[in-house]
């Protein structure tokens, strides 16, 4: 019997968003293009490389299909 392996990147939804507010513990309130706000946290690569994210920055986020109210910030646009 073989297991059906679902690739992590295929199940994620990537969209661009704008950082609205800084929250504690590397969490941010981001605004989606449809004007909905959700909470996003910083990915490990951004945290390791000490990339600063400030309100007003445009970022790329990954939304999980299981919990669309939370996201992970994967890239900050310059």
Swiss-Prot record:
PROSITE patterns per record: S1_IF1_TYPE
Q: Where in the cell is it found?
A: Cytoplasm
Q: MF terms per GO, please?
A: ribosome binding; rRNA binding; translation initiation factor activity
What SUPFAM superfamilies would the database entry show? Answer: Nucleic acid-binding proteins
**Mind telling me which GO cellular component terms the entry cites?**
cytosol
Transmembrane parts of this sequence: none
Name the InterPro entries for this protein.
Answer: NA-bd_OB-fold, RNA-binding_domain_S1_IF1, TIF_IF1
Which intervals hold domain S1-like?
2-78
Q: Which Pfam families does its entry note? A: eIF-1a (PF01176)
List the keywords (alphabetical): Cytoplasm, Initiation factor, Protein biosynthesis, RNA-binding, rRNA-binding
Q: What does this protein do?
A: One of the essential components for the initiation of protein synthesis. Stabilizes the binding of IF-2 and IF-3 on the 30S subunit to which N-formylmethionyl-tRNA(fMet) subsequently binds. Helps modulate mRNA selection, yielding the 30S pre-initiation complex (PIC). Upon addition of the 50S ribosomal subunit IF-1, IF-2 and IF-3 are released leaving the mature 70S translation initiation complex.
Q: Which NCBIfam families match?
A: infA (TIGR00008)
What family does the database annotate? Belongs to the IF-1 family.
Q: How does it assemble?
A: Component of the 30S ribosomal translation pre-initiation complex which assembles on the 30S ribosome in the order IF-2 and IF-3, IF-1 and N-formylmethionyl-tRNA(fMet); mRNA recruitment can occur at any time during PIC assembly.
Q: What is this protein called?
A: Translation initiation factor IF-1
Which species is this UniProt entry from? Onion yellows phytoplasma (strain OY-M)
From the UniProt record, report the name of the gene that encodes this protein: infA
